[in-house]
Amino acid sequence: MALFGSLDSMPLEELLLVLKSKEGALEIWNVKGLPATTLYLKPGRIRSIDQRGKPLPPEAAKAVLLTLLKAREGSFEFLPNLRPRHRVRLNWPTEKALLSLV
């Protein structure tokens, strides 16, 4: 299931709930103050958050996720079945991550 759109029509928290049973890469760009960001997802989990092709450490990933959750401008595309090329994993439960940051 390929999915694309803008954060003004579907905020990230809604988007993550729609995608909670999917595996793939959620690419987000045109968010003020952030470079293009990729969230790698697997069912029920945020596997990794990457910028410029590199995984972010947990504290930086939390800050970026919080900024993305607040963003109401930006574009996204979900690419199913893509996995990160690196072995760094956050492996955060999606709903727990949303509840702890919102």
What does each model-identified segment do?
Residues 1-102:
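Acidic, Ser/Thr/Pro-enriched low-complexity segments and adjacent helix/loop capping patches
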